[in-house]
């Protein structure tokens, strides 16, 4: 269960989310796990502890909480290009000013909305297994791979994604899929 805010102004991004270690059974010590490719990460875990990770690399960040509760996590750093926040029970993900973000995996959450307009470099998106009713990809012309299966989508317009090569959109309520200008599509 949580809200997320991610900002990359070209030099620094910010990620905020609310995380419940185990919302159904309320067991303590269930780890928070996410993957981020960026540099100079600073993390406030929301439980009085923090971490600093230097260098530009892919970080598999893991934190074990010793108590139950809802934790407000703040992550900041430089030059984010890859973000994996799957399986975190997120209900809100807000991306702001992320011009270098190329890969986003926010699958298996509880998202109802996803605004990707601030991410023009996005090439691969996994937003499957959420509660998305709409998905606007008109600002993502570099998108090559999309997995939007297992949502509540009724229409999907990919006409402004001319580089799209693979599309997974099964198990939705789709009545219309527009693939105009998607000449590179290899898999539907």
Name each model feature, range by range.
Residues 83, 93, 114, 135-137, ...:
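Canonical leucine-rich repeat
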Residues 96, 115-120, 138, 159-162, ...:
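C-terminal helix/turn sub-motif of individual leucine-rich repeats
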Residues 88, 109, 130, 148-151, ...:
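Consensus "Asn ladder" position of solenoid repeat domains
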Residues 83-85, 102-106, 123-127, 144-148, ...:
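Conserved hydrophobic beta-strand positions in leucine-rich repeat
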Residues 90, 101, 111, 132, ...:
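Glycine- and aspartate-rich repeat motifs characteristic of hemolysin/RTX-like Ca2+-binding segments
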Residues 1-102, 120, 141, 183:
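N-terminal capping/linker segments that flank leucine-rich repeat
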